[in-house]
Amino acid sequence: MSDLDIQIPTAFDPFAEANAGDSGAAAGSKDYVHVRIQQRNGRKSLTTVQGLKKEFSYNKILKDLKKEFCCNGTVVQDPELGQVIQLQGDQRKNVSNFLVQAGIVKKEHIKIHGF
């Protein structure tokens, strides 16, 4: 009999790309802002924004994002990733455009991940 290379599917980890490149560096030390989407139950999804500089007020940015896109959101403190902004729904393009127009980050420093 011959040995077959069988790949067993595993759970999708949306933060795998970010953790693979990190060599113990803290969140925010890189120049990139990562905008990701996470699938929840059914058609529901969650948009996460990670990597903003620490001198920004995350709560003020979140307040403007919630008001602009009519969605709910929160700031989560993660031990590995630092502060992460979470928004309901697929807001990846909206968030990236908002961050560029507000002058928070340059367009070439935003990485959009997801489907």
UniProtKB/Swiss-Prot annotation:
Q: Which residues span the membrane?
A: none
Any GO MF annotation of the entry: translation initiation factor activity
**Family matches, as Pfam families:** SUI1
The UniProt keywords, alphabetically, are:
Initiation factor, Protein biosynthesis, Translation regulation
> Which GO annotations describe the biological process of this protein?
regulation of translation
Family annotation (InterPro entries): SUI1, SUI1_dom_sf, SUI1_euk
- Keyword Protein biosynthesis annotated: yes
Family the UniProt entry places it in:
Belongs to the SUI1 family.
Q: What is this protein called?
A: Protein translation factor SUI1 homolog
Annotated organism of origin: Oryza sativa subsp. indica (Rice)
